[in-house]
Amino acid sequence: MQIGSRTIGKNHPPFIIAELSGNHNQSIDNALKLVQAAADCGVDAIKLQTFTPDSMTLNLSSEDFIITDQKSNWYNQQLYELYKKAYTPWEWHETIFNEAKNLGLEFF
């Protein structure tokens, strides 16, 4: 199997993918810094998820839609609001793609 210029499979080095996810804290600058940090760590690719809160959950405040684990960093937060914070705007894709490409990374 081939991904970009890399052969994937037995007797080949692992293909390492960094997940950008919502770790950008709603900042394109942070997102680009994370891409750079991943490249500095030697990853082969960046994976990006884009979703909207509406595609993940309902905008409800009942117990089923609140994080109740007191050990969680997101304790007592509504899922819908949490997904709003983690949302990666579609408009960022091209910029992140170009940064990944400039750094020699594949982009998913």
Where are these regions (language model features)?
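N-terminal amphipathic alpha-helix/helix-capping segment at the start of soluble metabolic enzymes
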Residues: 1-17, 93-94, 98
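Hydrophobic faces of well-ordered beta-strands that scaffold small-molecule active sites
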Residues: 16-18, 46-48, 107
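Conserved, mostly hydrophobic/aromatic
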Residues: 19, 38
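Glycine-rich, proline-tolerant flexible connector loops at the mouths of alpha/beta enzymes
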Residues: 26, 44-87
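Aromatic/hydrophobic pocket-lining residues that form the small-molecule binding cavity
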Residues: 31, 89, 93
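Non-catalytic positions within long, well-ordered alpha-helices that form the structural scaffold/packing
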Residues: 39-40, 101
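A structural motif
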Residues: 42-43, 105
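Catalytic beta/alpha-barrel core
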Residues: 82-89, 104-108
